[in-house]
Amino acid sequence: MILLTGATGTVGKALLPMLVEGGEEIRALVRDPRRLGRHRVAVRITLGDLGEMGDARTRRQALRGVQTVIHLAAAIRDQPVAKVEELNGLATARLLRAAEETGVERFIFFSAIGATEFERTRFFRAKALAEAAVEGSDIATTVFAPSIVYDRNDPWVTLTRRLSLLPALPLVGRADAAYEPIWAQDVARCVIAELDGAKPGKRRYELAGPERLTYEEMSRVIAWSIDRRRQTVHVPANLIRLGLNGVRRVVGDAAFATWEEAELLEVPMVSERGTADAEALGVKPKRMADVLAA
C-alpha cells in the first residue's frame, strides 16, 4: 500500500489518477475527502493534515499496512495550528520517524530546487531541513527537487490569468528570478517511473522543464494562453509586502495571497542538470506555452 500526502495539491491531482489506474492500493491523508473528486471512492482515507503529524494516533492510522510513503504535502503559509517551519520541516521528520518505526520500506519526498538552510525564505529553509532528515534515514529514500510546478488550472496560473484581465499585469518587484517550470503531469510521470523502475535505494532527482524563464516571462506566457497581451507593471516588493500583510490582518486565512507566497517568486529555481534527470526516468518535459495552449 502507498500512503499519499498532498493528494489534492497540484502534483497530487496529477499523480493520484496514475496510481489508481496502475492498480496501486492507495491511502490518502487529506483534510477534506470531497476534494479528491471521483477518486474518493478508489482510495482509503485518513483524515488529517501536516498540522496533525504531531498526533501519534494520526500517524499510526495513516501508516497502517503501508510499504511506500509519497510525501507531497507542503505549506507555503502559516496556518492557525502551526508555522511554515513546523508544517514542512517538523511534520516531515515526524512522518519519516513513524515510517521507520512501522516498517515502511520506501519514503519518497518532494523538496525544491534551491532549498538550502541559508535561503532567505522560511519555506525553503524548512524544506532543506526536511530533505536532510530524509537523506539521513536508514530506509530507502528518493528525493524529488522540482523547479516551479504548474498545471493548466492551478491556483497560481488561475490568479495570473485573472490579473491579466487588468489594463496592465502587476508583478512583484523586478520579476527577474529565473525558473525552469515543469508541468505537473510530467512530474507525476517521473514519480511513476521511479516506482516502477530500479530497486529502492538512495536517489535524488532535480526536475526541471525545458526552458529557463524569468517570473515576468512566465507571467506573459500565462497571459498569452488566454490571448491577453498586456504590458507589465513592476510593483515594489515593499509595497506588495505591506499590502498583503494588511489584507491578511483583515481577512485572516481567507487572504487570496500572503507575502510568504509572493516572496517565493523572487527566489531562483534552476538546475544545472536541466531536463537530464527527468529524461533519465523516461520523461521529456513539455514547454509551458505548449501545455497551456492545449
Where on the chain are the PLM-derived regions?
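SDR active-site strand-loop-helix element
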Residues: 5, 29, 69-73, 107-113, ...
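Short alpha-helix in the Rossmann-fold core of NAD(P)-dependent oxidoreductases
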Residues: 85-89, 108, 127
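Oxidoreductase cofactor-interface core, primarily capturing Rossmann-like NAD(P)-dependent enzymes
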Residues: 15, 22, 117-228
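A short helix->loop->beta-strand "cap" motif at the edges of active sites that frequently abuts
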Residues: 101-106, 139
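NAD(P)H-binding glycine-rich loop region in Rossmannoid oxidoreductase-like domains
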Residues: 34-38, 43-94, 98-101, 113-117
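N-terminal Rossmann NAD(P)H-binding glycine-rich loop of SDR-like oxidoreductase domains
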Residues: 2-24
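Mid/C-terminal beta-alpha module of Rossmann-like enzyme folds, strongest
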Residues: 194-259, 268-294
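Conserved glycine-rich Rossmann-like NAD(P)H-binding loop of the short-chain dehydrogenase/reductase
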Residues: 24-31
